[in-house]
Amino acid sequence: MPLCKRYVACLKNYAIMSDDVKKYTVEEERWNAVSHSVGIVGGLVVSALFIKEVIAKGGDGWALASVLLYMFGMLSSYTFSTLYHACSPASRWRKKLRKLDHSAIYWHIAGSYSPITLIAMRDVGYWGWGIFLFCWLCAIVGTSLSLYSLKKHNILETVCYVLMGLTIVVAMKQFYNAVPLRVFLWVVGEGVAYITGAVFYSFHKVKYIHTVFHFFVLLGSVCHMLAVWYVLNTML
């Protein structure tokens, strides 16, 4: 229960900080930017490997599209996060990049679901397409909230992030039965990494804690990359 309370506290803190951006030191922002720039480099390398794997395995158009959506979401998220943290607080681009940073989180989440739903679960009743459409609909709505009225809807935005992230729980049994065990375990590991990062994020007054949070986001991404790799490797 303490972990659950800490996670709830994190969500409340995130909503508050979305409205009044925390002022990080120059050194903190440097590390915040550097940490997610690692995600850009890793994402580019993995993108090439995944696309090559889909083509080599003779994957259909849906498989390729799902991987492209995943790569788009992940790279957009890390790119805008890096640019936002690297941008001077005095720059007129700072607020615009913040909106894009928040929007790209939706794309990252929806993109991450795409290979799982369009390859591993596409033929599992209506679950694959249902989750895919739900997540991308949430991403569209969430992007609108972030771009046009971020301050007014920061709590709603946080709820959208959480709902999207937990969508797979609704079809956990179907997902477990549809994929190899190691895929399931890597996705579980991803969830643990993100929740752990959220717990650390709740200590937002601690110096460099945002960089620590970024580390767990990267760890979650690595877990998901491995899950998708095994989906491509075993299910195409």
State what each model feature region is.
Residues 4, 11-236:
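Multi-pass alpha-helical transmembrane bundles in non-GPCR membrane proteins
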